[in-house]
From Swiss-Prot:
Cytoplasmic side of membrane: 28-46, 93-109
Bilayer disposition of the protein: Multi-pass membrane protein
Pfam short name (any one): DUF350
Keywords: Cell inner membrane, Cell membrane, Membrane, Transmembrane, Transmembrane helix
Transmembrane region(s): 7-27, 47-67, 72-92, 110-130
Family, similarity comment: Belongs to the UPF0719 family.
Protein name as catalogued: UPF0719 inner membrane protein YjfL
Length: 132
C-alpha cells in the first residue's frame, strides 16, 4: 500500500508541476512585448536562448518547492512566487536594456543570452532562498 501512496504523491506533484509550468509559459509569453513562440518557430536563436533560460529559471525553484513543500497548497504558493520572481527579472533586465524585445526580435544573440542567463540566475537564487 505504501508504494501506491508514493505513486499518488508523485503523480500529484508532477502533474501539478507540469500544469504550473504551462501556466507560467502562457503568462510570461503574454507579458513580454515580443511573441516568443513565433520567434522560435522562425528560428530566432536570441528568442530561444531567452525563453529557454526563463523556463529553466522557473523550473529550478519549482523543483526545489516540490522537494520541500509540506502540502499541495504550499507547492502552489512557491510556484506563484517563482513566477513573480521571473517577471521581476524580466522587468529588471528591461530597465537595464529598454530595447530588449526589439533586440531579441532582431536576432541579437547577446541580448537573448543575457536575458536567459539573468532568468536562470534569478531562478537559482530564488531556489536557494526558499525557506520553510
Amino acid at each position: 500500500m505504501h508504494i501506491l501512496d508514493s505513486l499518488l504523491a508523485f503523480s500529484a506533484y508532477f502533474f501539478i508541476g507540469v500544469a504550473m509550468v504551462i501556466i507560467f509559459l502562457f503568462i510570461y509569453s503574454k507579458i513580454t512585448p515580443h511573441n516568443e513562440w513565433q520567434l522560435i518557430k522562425n528560428n530566432n536563436t536570441a528568442a530561444s536562448l531567452a525563453f529557454s533560460g526563463t523556463l529553466l529559471g522557473y523550473v529550478i525553484p519549482l523543483s526545489s518547492a516540490a522537494i520541500n513543500a509540506v502540502s499541495i497548497p504550499d507547492y502552489f504558493a512557491w510556484g506563484g512566487i517563482a513566477l513573480v520572481i521571473q517577471l521581476l527579472v524580466f522587468a529588471g533586465v528591461r530597465l537595464y536594456m529598454p530595447a530588449l524585445s526589439e533586440k531579441i526580435i532582431n536576432h541579437n544573440t547577446a541580448a537573448g543570452m543575457f536575458m536567459g542567463t539573468a532568468a536562470l540566475a534569478g531562478g537559482i537564487f530564488n531556489a536557494a532562498c526558499m525557506t520553510w
